[in-house]
From Swiss-Prot:
Residues 53-72 form the Peptidase A1 domain. The lineage of its organism: Eukaryota, Metazoa, Chordata, Craniata, Vertebrata. Residues 1-37 form a propeptide. One of its GO terms (biological process) is proteolysis. Gene3D superfamilies: 6.10.140.60, Acid Proteases (2.40.70.10). SUPFAM superfamilies: Acid proteases (SSF50630). It comes from Thunnus orientalis. It is an enzyme of class 3 (hydrolase). InterPro entries: Aspartic_peptidase_N, PEPTIDASE_A1, Peptidase_aspartic_dom_sf. Belongs to the peptidase A1 family. GO terms for molecular function: aspartic-type endopeptidase activity. Keywords: Aspartyl protease, Hydrolase, Protease, Zymogen. This is Pepsin-2. Its EC number is 3.4.23.-.
């Protein structure tokens, strides 16, 4: 069992807002909050671009480090 430090980074939304690209992103990938109530038998996934916590995981010898987003 390993413990990883939790690091707070910028969300994709924050990055896009800083660059002035958030509105274009939302137009290209619209958010439909009522979609989950449709009676078509599917469960749509949405990307709100607001994941901001991650950890650094190192694997191998020599170690290679990866940023891993903890989204659940």
């Amino acid at each position: 069992f390993h413990k990883l430090p939790l690091i707070k980074g910028k969300t994709a939304r924050e990055e896009l807002q800083e660059r002035g690209l958030w509105e274009d992103y939302r137009k290209q990938y619209p958010y439909h909050p009522m979609a989950k109530f449709y009676q078509d038998g599917t469960e749509p996934m949405t990307n709100d671009a607001d994941l901001s916590y991650y950890g650094v995981v190192s694997i191998g010898t020599p170690p290679q480090s990866f940023k891993v987003i903890f989204d659940t």
